[in-house]
């Protein structure tokens, strides 16, 4: 004969309620960490990285909140190319590249378009295509058809390089010459950087999550093969350590009151009158 069914001890019910409360507290903490205050100020660093070489093309730090710290970023096209665009000898007049002043100058006058890799669109290909396998994948750039997008996170446009490009007598000069190599050339710049680019965040870029880096491909628009550059944009968020309060020096133990200095007494000998 089976014994009667007994209810669970009351302590089991208490444990169940304790577990529910604990889970609720953890969930609340998790929500709090995942959704920080929009007014919290952080030390925020934006980095543009050459995905082929791993070198940084730009690193800009600023203080701000997660909703307003979206600065304009400046970098040079050759910083995301490196030596990957140095054409072979089979292409004697390529009109692009970063290894010679004239190629940098010609490249400066060439249109380009940019395609996002974070969108994961199959028809646009992968890194080997610069995420621009077919027309229509481009979302920004500097071309005659002015590519644009309502959903991508950035725009990339050409900047303006100060300085002259042609000296008297027809000789070429200016910022496309590296001053470390051509110190006597008028207007030569550090590294011969004369292909400045300006990256700005769109409204969608200000609203998206930047928990990890996002990648793009840039291609020159030219006759023949359009060379590819790959870069990423990432954000690092660091909390600001509050300054420690400065107070009076701590009182040392066994301190005695300062001793009073006793002035020596002088014996005055009266003079006879």
Swiss-Prot record:
One BP annotation, GO: fusion of virus membrane with host plasma membrane
InterPro entries: FMuLV_rcpt-bd, TLV/ENV_coat_polyprotein
Residue segments, region Disordered: 242-273
Disulfide bonds: 115-132, 124-137
A cellular component term, taken from the record's GO annotations: membrane
Keywords carried by this UniProt record: Disulfide bond, Fusion of virus membrane with host cell membrane, Fusion of virus membrane with host membrane, Glycoprotein, Host cell membrane, Host membrane, Host-virus interaction, Membrane, Signal, Viral attachment to host cell, Viral envelope protein, Viral penetration into host cytoplasm, Virion, Virus entry into host cell
Membrane side Extracellular: residue ranges: 35-273
Residues glycosylated per entry: 43, 58
Region forming the signal peptide: 1-34
PTM annotation: Specific enzymatic cleavages in vivo yield mature proteins. Envelope glycoproteins are synthesized as an inactive precursor that is N-glycosylated and processed likely by host cell furin or by a furin-like protease in the Golgi to yield the mature SU and TM proteins.
Job of this protein: The surface protein (SU) attaches the virus to the host cell by binding to its receptor. This interaction triggers the refolding of the transmembrane protein (TM) and is thought to activate its fusogenic potential by unmasking its fusion peptide. Fusion occurs at the host cell plasma membrane.
Quaternary structure note: The mature envelope protein (Env) consists of a trimer of SU-TM heterodimers attached by noncovalent interactions or by a labile interchain disulfide bond.
Identification of the protein by name: Envelope glycoprotein
């Amino acid at each position: 004969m089976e014994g009667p069914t007994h209810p669970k001890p009351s302590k089991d019910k208490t444990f169940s309620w304790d577990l529910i409360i604990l889970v609720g507290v953890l969930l609340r903490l998790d929500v709090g960490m995942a959704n920080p205050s929009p007014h919290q100020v952080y030390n925020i660093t934006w980095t543009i990285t050459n995905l082929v070489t791993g070198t940084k093309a730009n690193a800009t730090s600023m203080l701000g909140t997660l909703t307003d710290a979206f600065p304009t970023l400046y970098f040079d096209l050759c910083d995301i190319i490196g030596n990957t665009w140095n054409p072979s000898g089979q292409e004697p007049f390529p009109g692009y590249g970063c290894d010679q002043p004239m190629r940098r100058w010609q490249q400066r006058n060439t249109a380009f378009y940019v395609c996002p890799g974070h969108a994961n669109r199959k028809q646009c290909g992968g890194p080997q295509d610069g995420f621009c396998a077919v027309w229509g994948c481009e979302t920004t750039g500097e071309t005659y058809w002015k590519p644009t997008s309502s959903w991508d996170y950035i725009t990339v446009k050409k900047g303006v390089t100060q300085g002259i490009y042609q000296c008297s007598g027809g000789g070429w000069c200016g910022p496309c010459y590296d001053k470390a190599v051509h110190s006597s050339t008028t207007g030569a710049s550090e590294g011969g950087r004369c292909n400045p680019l300006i990256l700005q965040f769109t409204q969608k870029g200000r609203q998206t999550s930047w928990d990890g880096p996002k990648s793009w491909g840039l291609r020159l628009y030219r006759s023949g093969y359009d060379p590819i550059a790959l870069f990423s944009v990432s954000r690092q968020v660091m909390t600001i350590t509050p300054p420690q309060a400065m107070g009076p020096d701590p009182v040392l133990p066994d301190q005695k009151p300062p001793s009073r200095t006793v002035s020596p007494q002088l014996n005055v000998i009266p003079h006879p009158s």
